[in-house]
Amino acid sequence: MKMRAQLPEYVAEVYDPTCGDGGLLRIFGDDVCKYGVEIDGAEAEKARSIPNSMIFAGDTLSKDYFPNIQFDTIIANPPFGIPWAHPTQQPDENKAKHASEIFDNYPTYAPANCADLAFIAHILYKLSDNGAAVCLMGLGALYRGRAEAKIREYLVDRGVFSRIELIRDAQFEDTSIPVAMLTMRKSSQDKSILFVDGEVERRVEYSEIKENGFDLSVNRYVNAEKQEDKWKDFDPYAHEEMIRAKVCENLDESITLSKVLCKIDPCLNPIDDFLDSLQAVINKHRASESSPDNQTTTEDCL
């Protein structure tokens, strides 16, 4: 497995801050102590079946479930692009305290509407001084501007990233999308980064990364033209539009099927209840986007 290959051969313990049902923890032997946190209680319960494990159900960005412990090995595949309650919006003082701690000395917090770099900050907060971490991340975290650009600059200045690989066909449920695999350490004097795209790789010095505004997109540094495959001209913005269209298409099909089932089985809850639930989700996200802290301008895309 690509992620396991980036970690030391001998691992005594491993931590996954967003462990789901424990899929990544299961790649380690029964002799390895496994620690995890998962926000979905049902998924956390499945993960508890893993031998030699300690799993908590909860929000890893709101509480340190393993206080005073730092891990030599961390592996993670956090959800991409989800909102989070950073300290300025967190009414619970204890939860706000942990969110502040993971961003201690950072120039700013991750934006409220995207927790990608908050997960990175948490991973580094829990990583031991000589530890190694590997994490899958959506490609947007590598190039988005404003607050995230400032955080990337801070991380590159600390020598956090040793390797960034473009995984062009990562499997997620029923779809295959490109993601980035980040190999990280607590800090290092070596600020260069090895960028990898399939068989092509290139080590890039700090000065060049700085010239590019701390954009860490693999295709910016690796000669993607040598990669003769369908992804060589990958456009992340067009891809996002395609995903949104697919979500709408799948939702339409699901609603149509649900309407048919309601006609067949009158014991099912009325379709209107389902539609009301969907509308509530839409209204929630419209409200969050309209708040001043989440306003997006043209500058956000630069």
Each model region followed by its residue ranges:
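A conserved structural/catalytic subdomain of Rossmann-like adenosyl-cofactor enzymes
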Residues: N68, D72-L302
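Conserved S-adenosyl-L-methionine
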Residues: M1-A76, G81-P83, N130, G138-G140, ...
